[in-house]
Amino acid sequence: PVYGTLKPVRTWNPVIINFKHLWQLLKDAWHAERYFDKIRIWFMPTGWRPADVKEKFPLLEVTNPAKQLKYNTNNSRWLFAYSWTQLVITHLLLFHLLIIFSNQSNAMNYLYAVVLLLSVFSFTSMLDNNNYAFFAELLKAGLVFALLSIQDLSWYGLQGISVYLFITYIIFSLVLTFY
């Protein structure tokens, strides 16, 4: 058996993958000529599209999985190593968030989650060879430094050498993404 989606997403970025389907539904609802179809699209089974939209705006669909070309961005070994390192660090930060979750306000927990989301968005955008990886990393660094400022140079309970190592990681991450 072959597993996967019938409409290839052509990205490594899980944030884009999650919103790509919603965006497609919004576009289909916008382009549908009949008002009934504009509403019905939200309640129909997965894959259903109005006939007029299907005709005017066809989507690439996999009809024969055996002949499907795999998504390949021809990344360097360095980029794979960098991405794996980012993934491991992001997981460690996620574990930290889960450990201290009940000690923080919801707003602070959400901001920490946004930092993690920006991190994943950045390194997976690099895997896709997209230029906006740097802007995501820049936004992440700005949010991190704002949160460090709010918490008197503490990162959610981490202090001392741990914070300096974290700051070093953020700076290196930004510089390497720019490179």
Predicted regions and their residues:
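Substrate-recognition/cap regions that form aromatic- and gly/pro-loop-enriched pockets
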Residues: 70-179
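Cytosolic/stromal cytosol-facing helical appendages immediately following the last transmembrane segment
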Residues: 1-83, 132, 168-179
